[in-house]
Amino acid sequence: MLLMVTTLAAYSQKTSLTTVNSVRPKRGDKMAFEAAYKQHIAKFHKEAQEKINVYEVLSGPYQGYYHLVNSGQSYEGLDKDRSDATAHDMDLDKTFYPLLDETMNGTYRFMDSLSIHSDVQAEKFVVNVRHIKPSLEADYRAESARSAKVQGKLKGGFWDNLSINVFEQLWDGNDPTVVSIRNLKEGFKSLETDFYGVASVGAPTFKDEYVKEYGTADWDKRVKLMDDAVVKHEQYIMKFRKDLSSQ
């Protein structure tokens, strides 16, 4: 299943939710879909609480999907209905859904303790979706928090520019899912080896700093856990579509 979200600043605990509608236009209807959605956005998604950001998947088995993202939500907000719900839904039924081949929905919670330099703004992204073994979910989260803490301390061109936002999918049954989004503020070109410069000779690596903080035995446990805990791993790149998003 496709699971994805957006780049976000660190929200407060009360507005840490993001809802995502992932859609795939029918073959041959890509441009018609974009035109119809622009009109829908202009009519129904102007207010702050209703604004939508749109992202287009550019690689992998979900290439051609769009993520329609409503971020900064709260649990309380999930109880509220739109005042224009009937007109909104009728517009979708008439101009939006007929152009789609598939649609999937999900709700995600931002994980500040697992994220690194989360306030970076970008328009290009690398997305990693990991499906976690339920029995190892708690251990995986704890270890991910450790890793983020160590990575946040590392210095140098690459580490100073590393920005990752992490989310957990809510209400995902027996398939715990963690989504990490690397924000590429310099674009896809920053994925080139040594784009931010070659590391200084003798500069501590992630492993060096981890072992310094937690010890060699814990490093060995980490390597095994991060491999054993992940049942399935998906990766793709995506870009922000400002032209399709709320203005």
Please annotate each region the language model reported.
Residues 1-15:
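Bacterial Sec-dependent N-terminal signal peptides
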Residues 12-247:
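Short S/T/G/P-rich N-terminal loop/turn motif that feeds into the first structured element of a domain
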